[in-house]
UniProtKB/Swiss-Prot annotation:
Lyase as UniProt keyword: no
Positions of post-translational N6-lipoyllysine modification: K65
Name of the protein in its database record: Glycine cleavage system H protein
Cofactor binding description: Binds 1 lipoyl cofactor covalently.
């Protein structure tokens, strides 16, 4: 299956994305990760004000197949969480790179974005799996 990974996004090995919008960064799960999970039934996200540490778990996503941890692609403080997604977790499947975003954070170290994969590198990694 072919996936569309937006060029302006950066991707972590653990399949989360980060998208810089002015001083804030939107975080979500890639379309590949969402596809692998199947039907999503529950999403657990941290509260606004919570601190994220790059590479550490910040929540879980539950599908009919499994419960998976989600890992922070960047360190920072949660500014916003997608409340609509908490009420309707299936939105994550419908539009993972758009309305299915998870969090907006204030990054602690914006240079961490440079350590994430660009879309072409991530697409090649996914194609090789």
């Amino acid at each position: 299956m072919a996936f569309d990974f937006p060029d302006s996004y950066r991707y972590a090995d653990s399949h989360e994305y980060a998208w810089q919008d002015a001083a804030a960064v939107r975080i979500g799960l890639s379309a590949y990760a969402v596809d692998q999970l199947g039907d999503i039934v529950f999403v657990d996200l941290p509260e606004v004000g919570a601190e994220l540490n790059r590479g550490s778990s910040f929540g879980t996503v539950e599908s009919v197949k499994a419960v998976e941890e989600m890992y922070a692609p960047l360190s920072g403080v949660v500014l916003q969480r997608n409340e609509a997604l908490l009420a309707n977790p299936e939105e994550l499947q419908n539009d993972p790179h758009g309305e299915g975003w998870l969090l907006v954070i204030q990054p602690g170290d914006p240079s961490q974005m440079d350590q994430l994969m660009d879309a072409a590198t991530y697409a090649a990694k996914v194609a090789a799996t």
